[in-house]
Regions:
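Short, small-residue-biased leader/transition segments that mark boundaries at the very start
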Residues: 2-7
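Residue-level signature of catalytic and energy-coupling elements of molecular machines
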Residues: 11, 78, 165
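A charged amphipathic helix-loop-strand protein-protein interaction module that recurs
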Residues: 35-63
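P-loop NTP-binding catalytic core
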Residues: 54-124
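P-loop NTPase nucleotide-binding module
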Residues: 109-166
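Conserved catalytic network of the ASCE P-loop NTPase/AAA+ motor domain
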Residues: 119-121, 131-132, 149-156, 178-181, ...
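P-loop NTPase switch/communication element
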Residues: 148-199
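Conserved P-loop NTPase nucleotide-binding/switch module
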Residues: 205-257
Length: 257
């Protein structure tokens, strides 16, 4: 593993199967003297106890969503037996898989697109479109950082950015504090539904820009319209193979025309 430790992207543990990892440029399995190391249920139990600081109960709310975020902004997804109360998810037991996605920022990845988004005191409404795992969130994170910090050499002051981080992927917050660098003028609502969060930010935080990841629900688009009508700029992402693919979806068409 040594050559890849600084390049890890994810580590996946499945009960009864080899420990699997991905890194920049490839993937592999953990091996021992008998071959591929096979993960046991005890491995998963010990891993969950360790990453939760031996206080898994404190992550109950996050576990209902199938993941938790730990210090450093690393995201731990879990699968297993879902506990339901009617139609509501109450938690999870008999965990069978843990997927540790290691946080990584690409500072400067938005350099080439910033001239299209920011010109002196002007910020453009922006929609970033790509297929899953195409880098939307990474790009959005750096756009937020650059807008928030501003650029002194170009005499572009920073602006107040409000972020609704519904799934804790942009800021990677741990106990409410962003672990990723989103800039000095950025306020984050962590774990809040996008539609409700956008309304909250407009009412209470006076942002110049509101940023959200992965628009999709009808309620999201209504909230985006409210943000635009308030005079704020919106920067968001959406799943799609192309802009043409997205604008023909029901709620996007009205938004981007």
């Amino acid at each position: 593993l040594f050559p890849y430790t600084t390049l890890f992207r994810s580590i996946r543990l499945r009960v009864g199967r080899p420990l699997f990892y991905t890194y920049d440029g490839g993937e592999g399995f953990l091996t021992d003297h008998d071959g591929k190391y096979v993960v046991t249920r005890e491995d998963l139990k010990e891993t969950m106890e360790y990453i939760s600081g031996y206080s898994l109960y404190s992550y109950e709310d996050e576990m209902r969503q199938g993941f938790l975020t730990v210090q450093g902004g690393h995201r731990v997804g879990v699968t297993g037996k879902v506990i339901l109360d009617g139609n509501e998810i109450q938690g999870m037991k008999y965990i069978s898989c843990i997927n540790v996605r290691l946080a990584h920022e690409v500072v400067g990845c938005a350099d080439q697109v910033m001239p299209y988004i920011r010109k002196k005191d002007w910020v453009a409404h922006t929609l970033i479109v790509s297929p899953p795992r195409g880098g939307k969130t990474t790009l959005l994170r750096d756009i937020i950082r650059q807008l928030s910090n501003g650029e002194e050499k170009k005499k572009m002051p920073g602006v107040t950015v409000g972020v609704v981080d519904e799934r804790s992927e942009l800021a990677g917050s741990y106990q409410g504090v962003p672990q990723n660098d989103l800039g000095m003028r950025t306020d984050v609502l962590d774990g809040c539904p996008k539609a409700e969060g956008m309304e909250m930010l407009i009412r209470s935080m006076s942002p110049a820009v509101v940023a959200v990841d992965e628009l999709g629900r009808k309620e999201d688009f209504k909230a985006v319209e409210s943000v635009i009508h308030s005079g704020c700029k919106v920067i968001a992402t959406a799943h799609g193979n192309s802009i043409e693919d997205v604008i023909h979806q029901p709620y996007f068409e009205k938004l981007v025309r």
